[in-house]
Structure formats: structure tokens, C-alpha cells
Amino acid sequence: MRYIVLSFICVMFFVSCGDKNKSKSERFIQDSSGAINNVSVVTENEIWDGRVGEAIRAVLAKPIYGLPQDEPMFTISQIPPAVFSGFVTKNRTVLMVKLNREKGIDFSENVYAKPQKVITVSGKTREEVIEVLQENDAKIRETFRNAEIAERQRQMAKSPHSFESIKEKLKLTVGFPSVYRVAKSTDNFFWIRKDITTGTTNLMIFELPYSAIKRNDSLVNQVIKIRDSVGKLHIEGGVEGSYLATEEAYTPYLAETIIDNKPALETKGIWELRNAFMGGPFINYAIEDKINKRWVVLEGFVFAPSVDKRNYMLEMEAIIKTVKLE
């Protein structure tokens, strides 16, 4: 009996210690912070002012395709290692430069806060660091951008919409916040919009017959023709005879991607209000729903004259990438 009691006390002691250690570690991992699309770069001033700094800016400040004016993918805040402590370590996205180390790159999560992505680029010389940056430029951007999309989705999920009609009519769910309102709806089309200080952010959601898009060399032209016809039918401007269309002077970008584990076409470009003076960027995803023999199209477009549109477009992409098809 004495042995059983002693064993029980030992077990409870270790469990208690484990819980204390767990709670102690959790207290050290605080919530991350920082503005959307802002990356902290931790490196010495002289490195930042030289060729390594130029290479970092070439990776992180690359202009985003599909915006009316050049905007960098990320805003960069350079921080010397000597002052990288306390609150400044809590930024959601951090790039660290380590000299006099083995050449390489490390992708870590939740090092100083959560959620957080920390990328460390190392090299024995500055030239090696530059090589690592250039060899991994796309992966670095993708890692940070995915983190920002996830963060925007997390923020928007705090106040989700409650429009059951989208699920009922289109057999899908999409996670936009409650500040959006339905501007127009039919049996197979929804126009959702949100008022912002300088204009509006907008979403179109609709479905097409499976035969509407054929995978051949004219894919981008097919997508543009469809969006223009849908825009003319459903999105009218304030001026009589004006409607949503694609700006012909700007070549659209098209790429293959995956949305909701299904093949999809991603198209970026500039929209205009035909016969009026309005325009802005759009991002369009046509999802191939083989099970239900249809295409589901979700497009985000922004009207925000005289202000940067990068963060608005990230919100559009973040919303669209929450879609779940039944």
C-alpha cells in the first residue's frame, strides 16, 4: 500500500512539473504583432547600406504585378541586432542575416512570438549571403506572403458574415467578414462589397458550365471574355451605359494554381468602368470543379483612387482562398 501511495505521489509530482514548465514556456511565446505586409530585417547598418541590403530589397520590395502603380510586395523595417529585443522581436515576419556562418537558409516558426515566420540567411561572406538570397527569392516571398494571408484570414474570422444564400445557391462557403454586404444577387451570381475610406472593395462569385472554359492556348482570353460579359450583365456604373470590363492596355497575367485542393486559374489585371472614368486592380480565380461539372469563379476588385492598393488586394486574395466547395 505504501508503494502505491509513493508511486502516485511521484506521478503527480512529474505531471505538476510538466504543467508548470508548459505554462512557463507559453508565457514566453507571446502573440505576434505588426502591420500587414511589413517585414523586419535584422542586420547591421553597414550591411543594410551595401550590396546585401540591395539584394534583400530586390527580394522583398519586388513590385507586385497587377497594380496600377508600382507597389512593393513588402514594406521593410531594418533593425540592427543590438536593438532587436523586447517588443520588436514580436513582428510576424522576420528576416535575419548571419555573417561568418555556414552558407544556408533556415525557415523557422514561432521563435519569438506566435504566429511568426523567421527566415535566417547565412554565409561566411557577404557574397555568399547574396547568393542564398538570390537562390531562394521566390520561396522567401511565398513564405512571408502566405503568413500574411493567414493572418488576414484570422483577423476576418473574428466577425464572419451570415449570408446563407451563397451556400444555398452556389453550394460553397467563403469567409468574408460581416462588414461586407450583398450588392446584387441572382440564382448563380453574387456581388459582395465593402465601403472603405476612399472607395470600395468588391467580390464577384458565380458559376459557369463545365464547357465554358477549355484548356488550350487561349485560356487568358477565355477568362477575360467571361469576366467582361459578366461585368456588362451585372456590374453597372453610375453613368448610363457604363459597366465593368478589363483594361485592354494592360496585359493580364495568368497562372495555374490550387484552390480548395482543386486546379484553378489565377488571373491578375486592371479593370475599368467602360464609358466612365473608374478603374483599379483585380484578381480572378476560376476553380475547376470536376465533381460537380462546373467552374466556380471568384474575383476581387478594388476601387481606391489616389491610395495604395496592395493591402486591399491581399484582403481579396485572403477571402477567396477560404472558399470551400461542396
Give the positions of each predicted feature.
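Positively charged n-region of N-terminal signal peptides that target proteins for export
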Residues: M1-I4, G18-D19
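C-terminal motif of bacterial Sec signal peptides marking the signal peptidase cleavage site
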Residues: F13-S16
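N-terminal "mature-domain start" segment
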Residues: D19, S25-G34, D49, A58, ...
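Signature of long, low-cysteine stretches enriched in small and polar/charged residues
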Residues: K22, P72, I79-E128, K232-K293
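Secretory pathway targeting signatures of secreted, lumenal, and periplasmic proteins
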Residues: K22-R27, E44-E46, P177-E236, L244, ...
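Solvent-exposed alpha-helical segments and adjacent loops
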Residues: S23-T43, I47-G50, K98-S162
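N-terminal leader/propeptide segments of preproteins
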Residues: Q30-T93
